[in-house]
């Protein structure tokens, strides 16, 4: 089990070995670290690597790297965590602070303090708390190889933490140019990318790249979700402006998804804020789904920088209503023009259908109305004639009765064949089809036309009287029997003119 004294001996031995060849490069790399000409040519960068011993302790072996590793101004501490099995990577970054005048060493290398309790030392990045002025630096001078804790601005927190706690490097002070407080702990490839290049801009770069990727994922996911959720109004809005509006919209669809990926860092925000108004101005008008869809990519950068968001919103408010009104008009015009063919076709078809129905109903009512009209005219003619001469109505009625019979308005076939009396019976039945109440009122009008009461078959309209049937079927039989001469004359006069129109 390695103790702290063994580690200090090993570090002293290896530092004395590799100190001569590294002085010039490290002095060139970090000569201006603490302000005004405070350059120590004997400072060196040590890479501290720890291997977890089986008993649970961490054996730290400090070795000075070659010229390529010495040229870099940062090193990494890899500590394997036995509980999770994953290595905890901490960036040991040498920072340049031009505003610190009280630093007495050009290099600030964070060492790993191993607690005595046998547990592992976990070194990771410190979360951004409010104590930006505390900075714990362990420096190494060329003549003195033992470690000395030195506070740079104020009195630092004690370095010895309880067993199992972590020592975290402090973030950049707010006065440094690339300072951006990040609430995300640096882990994985971001710290290795931080360790590749010197300078404080890497912290801001990595801390910007991480919420940028997260916001990019949310942007693409929200855009795809909005596009998948509301395809109807979007399609309607796309087809509402035919011609140049569709490729214009297609070119603005791609920067909404590609601009977060193409432009990194603050340039991405500056570039994303430029197509924001145009995209939102050209897309927000035609439909509420597209307006809601474009409000998500605009509101995502608005959380990061509220001033460009408000400026963009103020910039949007000017072309927004005009475009909205104009495209709403064009959309309403297109919707009216697109719906008027449908409604026009629908109304035209309904008009044609209603015209056909009304024509049929008119023709049907005309077909029924002429029958009842002719029947009423016939009845009126017969009642108006009122003469005992039966020849006049019998000769005038058969052609009209033939037309009624061709329309098949008689309810039963005996009306077609039994000629003398069903003439009057057909008239009354056809008029009773058109208006049922008119036949009983007109039936007394038939009484002057028929001289004898036997021919009044209107009392039973559905079934003619058997006497009238006998008269119609067997005139010869009734000719043998004694019949009054006026009845015989009427039978002959009604039977003979009605037979020619028989089909």
Swiss-Prot record:
GO terms for molecular function: histone methyltransferase inhibitor activity. Residues 1-72, 97-462, 483-503 are annotated as: Disordered. Keywords: Cytoplasm, Nucleus, Phosphoprotein. Changing residue 407 to E: No effect on H3K27me3 levels. Changing residue 405 to E: Does not inhibit PRC2/EED-EZH2 complex activity and abolishes ability to decrease H3K27me3 levels. Its main location: nucleus. Residues 401-409 are annotated as: Sufficient for interaction with EZH2. In testis, detected in male germ cells inside the seminiferous tubules, especially in spermatogonia and round spermatids (at protein level). In the ovary, expressed in primordial follicles and oocytes but not the external follicle cells (at protein level). InterPro entries: EZH_Inhibitor. GO terms for cellular component: cytosol; nucleoplasm; nucleus. Residues 184-197 have a biased composition (Polar residues). Inhibits PRC2/EED-EZH1 and PRC2/EED-EZH2 complex function by inhibiting EZH1/EZH2 methyltransferase activity, thereby causing down-regulation of histone H3 trimethylation on 'Lys-27' (H3K27me3). Probably inhibits methyltransferase activity by limiting the stimulatory effect of cofactors such as AEBP2 and JARID2. Inhibits H3K27me3 deposition during spermatogenesis and oogenesis. PANTHER family: EZH INHIBITORY PROTEIN, EZH INHIBITORY PROTEIN-RELATED. Residues 41-72, 345-366, 428-453 have a biased composition (Low complexity). This is EZH inhibitory protein. The gene is EZHIP. One of its GO terms (biological process) is chromatin organization. Residues 1-16, 97-107 have a biased composition (Basic and acidic residues). It is found in: Nucleus; Cytoplasm. Residues 403-423 are annotated as: Necessary and sufficient for inhibition of PRC2/EED-EZH1 and PRC2/EED-EZH2 complex activity. The modification Phosphoserine is found at residue 259. Interacts with PRC2/EED-EZH1 complex member EZH1 and with PRC2/EED-EZH2 complex member EZH2; the interaction blocks EZH1/EZH2 methyltransferase activity. Interacts (via C-terminus) with SUZ12 which is a member of the PRC2/EED-EZH1 and PRC2/EED-EZH2 complexes. Changing residue 81 to Y: No effect on H3K27me3 levels.
């Amino acid at each position: 089990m390695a103790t702290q004294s063994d580690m200090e001996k090993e570090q002293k031995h290896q530092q004395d070995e590799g100190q001569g060849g590294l002085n010039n490069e490290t002095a060139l790399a970090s000569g201006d670290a603490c302000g005004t000409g405070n350059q120590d040519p004997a400072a060196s960068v040590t890479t501290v690597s720890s291997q977890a011993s089986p008993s649970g302790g961490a054996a730290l072996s400090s070795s000075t790297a070659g010229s390529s590793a010495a040229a870099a101004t940062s090193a990494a501490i890899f500590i394997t965590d036995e509980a999770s099995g994953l290595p905890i990577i901490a960036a040991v970054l040498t920072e340049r602070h031009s505003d610190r005048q009280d630093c007495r060493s050009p290099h600030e290398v964070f060492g790993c303090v191993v607690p005595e309790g046998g547990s592992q030392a976990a070194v990771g990045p410190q979360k951004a708390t409010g104590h930006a002025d505390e900075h714990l630096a362990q420096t190494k001078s060329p003549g003195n190889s033992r470690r000395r804790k030195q506070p740079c601005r104020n009195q630092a927190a004690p370095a010895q933490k309880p067993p199992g706690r972590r020592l975290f490097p402090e973030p950049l002070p707010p006065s440094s140019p690339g300072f951006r407080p990040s609430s995300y702990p640096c882990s994985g490839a971001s710290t290795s990318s931080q360790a590749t290049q010197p300078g404080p801009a890497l912290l801001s770069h990595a801390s910007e790249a991480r919420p940028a990727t997260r916001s990019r994922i949310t942007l693409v996911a929200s855009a795809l979700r909005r596009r998948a959720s509301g395809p109807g109004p979007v399609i309607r809005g796309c087809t509402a402006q035919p011609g140049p509006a569709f490729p214009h919209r297609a070119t603005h669809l791609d920067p909404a998804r590609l601009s977060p990926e193409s432009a990194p860092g603050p340039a991405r925000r500056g570039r994303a804020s430029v197509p924001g108004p145009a995209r939102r101005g050209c897309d927000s008008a035609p439909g509420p789904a597209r307006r809601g869809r474009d409000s998500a990519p605009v509101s995502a950068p608005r959380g990061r920088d509220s001033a460009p968001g408000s400026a963009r919103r103020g910039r949007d408010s000017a072309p927004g209503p005009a475009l909205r009104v104009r495209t709403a008009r064009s959309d309403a015009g297109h919707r009216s023009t697109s719906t008027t063919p449908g409604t026009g076709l629908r109304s035209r078809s309904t008009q044609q259908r209603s015209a056909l129905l009304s024509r049929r109903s008119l023709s049907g009512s005309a077909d029924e109305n002429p029958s009842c009209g002719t029947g009423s005219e016939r009845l009126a003619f017969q009642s108006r004639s009122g003469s005992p001469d039966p020849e006049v109505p019998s000769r005038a009625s058969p052609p009209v009765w033939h037309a009624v019979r061709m329309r098949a308005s008689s309810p039963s076939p005996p009306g077609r064949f039994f000629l003398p009396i069903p003439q009057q019976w057909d008239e009354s039945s056809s008029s009773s089809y058109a208006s049922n109440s008119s036949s009983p009122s007109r039936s007394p009008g038939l009484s002057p036309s028929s001289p004898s009461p036997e021919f009044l078959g209107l009392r039973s309209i559905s079934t003619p009287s058997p006497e009238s049937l006998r008269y119609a079927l067997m005139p010869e039989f009734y000719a043998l029997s004694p019949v009054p001469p006026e009845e015989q004359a009427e039978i002959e006069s009604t039977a003979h003119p009605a037979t020619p129109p028989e089909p």
